[in-house]
Amino acid sequence: MKQTKIKLLCLLLAVLMLFSLTACGKEKTADSNLIKLGDYELLYKGACIMEDSDGNDAIVLTLDFTNNGKENASYLWSVDETLMQNGVELEAATVFADYDTFETVIEGQFTDVAPGATVEVRTAYLLQDTTSPVEATFEQFLGKKSGKITIDPSSLNRETPAADTTGGEPP
């Protein structure tokens, strides 16, 4: 009888050890900057403050958009974004990346991304002020998945459009 109890105890301990080892392999560290939206992933890489076309302060977010779907997709038609500050939705901003070509910072949003590929996209919104936190919500365009990040504008750097290599001056 005593030998049966010892065998049963050993078996129970072996099963417990087996379950604890299996759990170790499945643990993943969550990246708070990674947002999964169904077939798409967004990785928040950072933000800065730039002037829009009217000289107002705008927050410019930089994200990696990964298409894990089966067909080509663009950020513009796959993700719905909303930025809020002080409880008010922020307006989209026109921020030029190049004054000579009138290219804006959001041009990457139109890029068709093949399945498994990633493209860097930027998005720009007018700030109400440069001190209050901004909450960015990203949702599947036609789905239920969403994710949020909060950004402190007071910790962001100010940036200007890329240097003009033609020798001209920005307006």
PLM segments and residue spans:
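Short, well-ordered beta-strand segments enriched in hydrophobic/aromatic residues
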Residues: I59-N67
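Bacterial N-terminal signal peptides that target proteins for export
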Residues: M1-L11
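Low-complexity, acidic Ser/Thr/Pro/Gly-rich terminal tails and inter-domain linkers that flank the onset
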Residues: K28-G55, P171
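A structural connector/turn signal
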Residues: A30, G108-Q109, R122
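C-terminal motif of bacterial Sec signal peptides marking the signal peptidase cleavage site
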Residues: S20-A23
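The feature marks short-to-medium sequence segments in extracytoplasmic or secretory-pathway proteins
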Residues: S53, T66-A117
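Ser/Thr/Gly/Pro-rich low-complexity, disordered linker/stalk segments of secreted
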Residues: T160-P171
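Short, surface-exposed ligand- or partner-binding patches at beta-edge/loop junctions that are enriched
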Residues: V119-I151
